Amino acid sequence: MAFNNEKTTWMDPDTNTAYALSAFNSFVTTYEIKPDKEGEPFSVPVRVIFSNHCYSRERKEEQANQIIDTQHRRDGTTEERVFCQKRWKFCQDLPMIIENLGLQKCFSGDRDIIYRQEQKSGVAAQDGWYICMRLDYREKKGPAFELWVRSVHWRRNRPVDIRNHGGQKFRQLLSQFAKKKGVFEP
């Protein structure tokens, strides 16, 4: 693994090209929600956390020196991850995309998963980068709301678990999630 000690940079061991990973630092942002239709909207802080799947992919034919992470799956198998320059390049704008997510159309999936489609190709409506995120709420943690950016993928079709094909604004999905968790006021 060719990370520096703080994992702020990854160095390609074959080309010695350095890739900054600062775009994947956790941060806190704020979104406006309205869980109660009769209530007033209010802002909630949300911690944003990035998985290394935002800049890596499953190993195929790459040399062992390209492996950046080994992950054990629930089914007992092991997945080796390698750096993905295409994902890394797309994700350089990811913090800004997440900051401005509130009024953007997103799709809900299973188990509190939310998808955002970016950079549509213009050829087919479903082509584009899909950002896969999961909402979490932990009342005793500060901030209580978390948005875990699980991965990004270029796809020609939508993920199979998308339920609302027309999509909703992110803040509406976050409001529904807050209501489900019993959060009706700041």
Regions found by a protein language model. Give the residues of each.
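Ribonuclease/tRNase effector modules and their secretory precursors
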Residues: 1-186
